[in-house]
Amino acid sequence: VDKPDYRPRPRPPNM
């Protein structure tokens, strides 16, 4: 089972 490359998600806007 090959794991997909996880890309760093952009931080959500702090509201």
From Swiss-Prot:
Domain of life: Eukaryota
Keywords attached to this entry: Antibiotic, Antimicrobial, Immunity, Innate immunity
Biological process according to GO: defense response to Gram-negative bacterium; innate immune response
The protein's role, per its UniProt record: Antibacterial peptide active against Gram-negative bacteria.
One GO CC term, this protein: extracellular region
Induction of synthesis: By bacterial infection.
Organism this protein belongs to: Palomena prasina
Official protein name in the record: Metalnikowin-1
